[in-house]
C-alpha cells in the first residue's frame, strides 16, 4: 500500500493575486505525489502570494486483498460454511497420497506419490486451489 500526498494552493489574504500564477500553481500541485515539497518550493510559492497545505493522504490499495464473505445466513458458524463448501466442492487434486512401503531392510517407510489424474475429474485453477487451501486452514484453526 502506498500513500500519496495531495497539496492545496491557498491565496494569502494581504497579497495581490494573478489568475495566471494561480492556475500554474494549481496545475503543478493538484495531482497526488509521493514526493515531498522542499523549503525552496514553499518559499517560491510564498513569494508569489500563495501558500501550500497538504490535504489528507490518499491510500492506494493493491488488488491483492482477500475477502471471505458468507452469503448463506441460515448457517450458525463459519465452520459450518467451510464444511458445506468442502462438501459441495471436493478436493479433486490432493497434492500427495502417502502410503507405506517396505524397503530393502524391511523397515516401514512412507513415500509420497502424486495421485494420477483421470479425464473425468474436474480441472481446478490456481484460484480454486488457493480458496480450498484457505478453507482448510480456517477449518484447522476452528
Swiss-Prot record:
Record note on disruption phenotype: RNAi-mediated knockdown results in embryonic lethality. RNAi-mediated knockdown results in chromosome segregation and cell division defects in early embryos. RNAi-mediated knockdown enhances the activity of the PIWI-interacting RNA (piRNA) silencing pathway. RNAi-mediated knockdown disrupts the localization of tofu-6 to the perinuclear region of the germline. RNAi-mediated knockdown results in larger tofu-6-, erh-2- and pid-3-expressing foci.
Keyword Protein biosynthesis: no
Role of this protein: Component of the tost-1 variant of the PETISCO complex which plays an essential role in embryogenesis. Within the complex acts as an adapter which binds to the complex via erh-2. Does not seem to play a role in the biogenesis of a class of 21 nucleotide PIWI-interacting RNAs (piRNAs) that possess a uracil residue at the 5'-end (also called 21U-RNAs). May inhibit 21U-RNA accumulation. Required for chromosome segregation and cell division in early embryos.
GO cellular component, one term: RNA cap binding complex
Spans traversing the lipid bilayer: none
Complexes and interactors: Component of the tost-1 variant of the PETISCO complex (also called the pid-3, erh-2, tofu-6, and ife-3 small RNA complex) containing at least tost-1, tofu-6, ife-3, pid-3, and erh-2, which plays an essential role in embryogenesis. Within the complex interacts with erh-2. Within the complex interacts with pid-3 and tofu-6. In contrast to the pid-1 variant of the PETISCO complex, the tost-1 variant of the PETISCO complex plays a minor role in the biogenesis of a class of 21 nucleotide PIWI-interacting RNAs (piRNAs) that possess a uracil residue at the 5'-end (also called 21U-RNAs).
Renumbered residue ranges of the record's region Disordered: 97-123
Protein name: Protein tost-1
Site, as annotated: May be required for interaction with erh-2: 42
Keywords attached to this entry: Cell cycle, Cell division, Chromosome partition, Cytoplasm, Nucleus
GO biological process: cell division; chromosome segregation; embryo development ending in birth or egg hatching; positive regulation of cell division; positive regulation of chromosome segregation
Compartment(s) where it occurs, according to its Swiss-Prot or TrEMBL record: Cytoplasm; Nucleus
Tissues expressed in: Expressed in the germline.
Superkingdom of source: Eukaryota
Amino acid at each position: 500500500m502506498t500513500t500519496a500526498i495531495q497539496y492545496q494552493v491557498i491565496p494569502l489574504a494581504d497579497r495581490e493575486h494573478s489568475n495566471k500564477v494561480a492556475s500554474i500553481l494549481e496545475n503543478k500541485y493538484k495531482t497526488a505525489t509521493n514526493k515531498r515539497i522542499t523549503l525552496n518550493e514553499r518559499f517560491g510559492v510564498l513569494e508569489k502570494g500563495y501558500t501550500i497545505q497538504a490535504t489528507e493522504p490518499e491510500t492506494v490499495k493493491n488488488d491483492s486483498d482477500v475477502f471471505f464473505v458468507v452469503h448463506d445466513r441460515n448457517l450458525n458458524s463459519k465452520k459450518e460454511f467451510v464444511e458445506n463448501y468442502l462438501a459441495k466442492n471436493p478436493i479433486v487434486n490432493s497434492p500427495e497420497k502417502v502410503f507405506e512401503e517396505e524397503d530393502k531392510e524391511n523397515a516401514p517407510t512412507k513415500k509420497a506419490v502424486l495421485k494420477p489424474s483421470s479425464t473425468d475429474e474436474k480441472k481446478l485453477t490456481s484460484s480454486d486451489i488457493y480458496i480450498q487451501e484457505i478453507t482448510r486452514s480456517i477449518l484447522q484453526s476452528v
